[in-house]
Amino acid sequence: MTEPSNSTPPVCSYEGSDYQRTFWETGQRQYEDAVEAIALKRLLPPQGELLLELGAGAGRNSPRYSGYTRVVLLDYSRTQLLQARERLGSAPRYIYVAADVYKLPFVTGLFDGATMIRTLHHMTEPGLALQSVRRVLAQDAIFILEFANKRNLKAVFRYLGGKQAWNPFSPEQVEFAALNFDFHPKTIRRLLAQNNFKIERQLAVSYFRVGWLKEHLPLGLLVGLDSAFQWTGAFAQYSPSVFIRARALGATQAVQRGSFFACPVCEAPLAESASSQTCPGCGNVWDYSEGIYDFRIKPAA
């Protein structure tokens, strides 16, 4: 059997984490959740066939993709996907896949839409991640990307005031914690263009992500203000979070009938089957259990 490749960049795994509850449900993040929902509603197409949700976690955003016939929830953490399945159920509309963004287990050109929310900031090689995403998208597919903005107002003021060493205006990414990165907007735009994406719209999101404001001002007021300011992302991005709607350019090979998955090691096509599969190309076995497809490449012994 061919040994799995270990050449991909490091992965930030939320395996065993109670992130959904501790961060979103009890972590006073109602403001962030609400303004991200507004941004998604503004950027998503009204309808589609098959959406790939990259970094789906426990399925916080998944119900917001109601315009798509089917949604593939992809995350590296199997325990996060188990939480998502518990929340969303086992309806055929949702497909749960444990996999690495750098090694997506799908045939080329499969999806007509994709989202990557609060996920790129864990990528040491964002260009490689975007290249992987583009491969599995059909021509003219819509890609909604969110990234943590290095050039946010707080970082700018701290830098100008001498309280921060790193420069928010320089193009390189900054790792503010292990496997947590902020990116410069120009760098992200360049990487999207290099990987055959055309930006159609940009939104500046979470301008009011300030502890004092969230404690002292009504949630509805903050959400309304953020909603009113999101359009400014069209010409300037100084918010903590930036949302981009991009379109996949260039021809993509047609998907063969019956093809869905692809081996992440050798890229041999695999059927969409609710059972474990042995790759006909390299012999690797990919597990299916508890409603979750597991295509994570295991380190060589």
Residue locations for each model-derived region?
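A conserved beta-strand element that flanks and buttresses the S-adenosyl-L-methionine
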Residues: 115
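Short catalytic micro-motifs in class I SAM-dependent methyltransferases
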Residues: 118-122
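A C-terminal cap/extension of S-adenosyl-L-methionine-dependent methyltransferases
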Residues: 162-165, 190, 201-269, 273
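Class I SAM-dependent methyltransferase SAM/SAH-binding core
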Residues: 52, 56-103
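Acceptor-substrate binding/catalytic loop of class I
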Residues: 166-187
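A short glycine-rich, Lys/Arg-flanked "PGG" loop and its adjoining helix->strand segment in the class I
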Residues: 127-142
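Conserved class I S-adenosyl-L-methionine
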Residues: 1-47, 60-61, 80-83, 143-168, 297-301
